[in-house]
């Protein structure tokens, strides 16, 4: 980090069914007080605090995967999914790995894009993380990814399109530039995203902007309380939550709904 500071993180492994979930924790001995607080909240931090969270998540996340591969013998990921711009720096870390092994910038960028996908969740520009270009330069000039030219990193997130702010570094823009494929999280959201990011594809009609959509979904039995399912069975005689006519929900009295609490 700048000013000869270091940021270390402990890796916690949680088992989600058969899927290992790796979590990064900066509250460890050896970090200064500011660094220990980087992972103290999910949202709400601003300025350098938020930037350091996203550097840790993206670049530190790739490093954590490499440690996990080495310790467990797990295969290396074949595809990296950047779920919103928060983890966008994972692409920079992967480019650094390739450049450290002799690739040039363009070759490393192409290789990284080839197996990276990006999902945007945000339907309004105000919801996207943006930093001053000077902040990004300050951190990367300190040697975060020594083999990667800082100007190349800055160009990835530059709002270099009509209506953009040349002084800002946009995490979603970087995510899109580092990905082979991109999607929104609903059909309408895909349309909104194509409009919102159309400046990245000058000369394309909005309908041709290469952002598709994958509709969010949930595993219904996991997310619906058994008491709600039982109420549906009692009121409508349905065998499972999949036998549904949502319009009949209006037949349930307010009292029955309050009693579920």
What do these predicted ranges mean?
Residues 1-261:
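Catalytic cores of carbohydrate-active enzymes across secretory and cytosolic contexts
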